[in-house]
């Protein structure tokens, strides 16, 4: 680019006019704003939301305390403590997820051999304090119990792709 061309581009502000023309084209188009609490957008079937722990049909929790989810978690958001029962099976005594650390990658769900930990379609949860986003085993089991039908349906729909 020669010095004269550069002078005319900067003197007549051609870049600025191109930007204003682009802005003007989008000014009168239809807006894509969604009024969130009243209007909902469609959620992907593979959306990863709030975590839940599942139980078997007989009421026993699925988690066998293999700690694969704790090992695979890149954010180190999962803490598990376990003990051996009288029948030589391991079960968790503590299963905590810190949602302030969690990046919702889904590795915990993928690594679980018994489909104990799942990520639900729930996206509307909050906490007033930092401690409200620290989910214990009992809280995760309560979420799983409450939404078991939805979780099972989502797992069945996603089964052909896994």
Curated annotation (Swiss-Prot):
Record-listed [4Fe-4S] cluster 2 binding positions: 73, 102, 105, 108
Membrane topology: Peripheral membrane protein
Record domain 4Fe-4S ferredoxin-type: where: 54-83, 93-122
Domain of life: Bacteria
EC number in record: 7.1.1.-
Residue positions binding [4Fe-4S] cluster 1: 63, 66, 69, 112
Cofactors, names only: [4Fe-4S] cluster
Single annotated GO MF: quinone binding
GO terms, biological process: aerobic respiration
Catalytic EC class: translocase
Positions of transmembrane segments: none
Record's catalysed reaction(s): a quinone + NADH + 5 H(+)(in) = a quinol + NAD(+) + 4 H(+)(out)
InterPro entries documented for this protein: 4Fe4S_Fe-S-bd, 4Fe4S_Fe_S_CS, NADH_quinone_OxRdtase_chainI
Assembly: NDH-1 is composed of 14 different subunits. Subunits NuoA, H, J, K, L, M, N constitute the membrane sector of the complex.
Function: NDH-1 shuttles electrons from NADH, via FMN and iron-sulfur (Fe-S) centers, to quinones in the respiratory chain. The immediate electron acceptor for the enzyme in this species is believed to be ubiquinone. Couples the redox reaction to proton translocation (for every two electrons transferred, four hydrogen ions are translocated across the cytoplasmic membrane), and thus conserves the redox energy in a proton gradient.
Protein's recorded name: NADH-quinone oxidoreductase subunit I
Organism: Burkholderia vietnamiensis (strain G4 / LMG 22486) (Burkholderia cepacia (strain R1808))
Taxonomic path: Bacteria, Pseudomonadati, Pseudomonadota, Betaproteobacteria, Burkholderiales
Gene name linked to the record: nuoI
């Amino acid at each position: 680019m020669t010095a004269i061309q550069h002078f005319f581009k900067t003197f007549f502000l051609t870049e600025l006019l191109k930007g204003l023309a682009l802005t003007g084209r989008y000014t009168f188009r239809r807006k894509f704003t969604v009024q969130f609490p009243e209007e909902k957008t469609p959620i992907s079937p593979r959306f990863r939301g709030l975590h839940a722990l599942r139980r078997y049909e007989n009421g026993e929790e699925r988690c066998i305390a293999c700690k694969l989810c704790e090992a695979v978690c890149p954010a180190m958001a999962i803490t598990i403590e376990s003990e051996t029962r009288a029948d030589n099976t391991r079960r968790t005594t503590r299963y905590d997820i810190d949602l302030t650390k969690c990046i919702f990658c889904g590795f915990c769900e993928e690594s679980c051999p018994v489909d104990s930990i799942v990520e639900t379609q729930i996206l509307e949860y909050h906490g007033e304090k930092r401690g409200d986003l620290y989910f214990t085993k009992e809280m995760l089991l309560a979420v799983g119990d409450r939404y078991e039908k939805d979780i099972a349906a989502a797992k069945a729909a996603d089964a052909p792709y896994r």
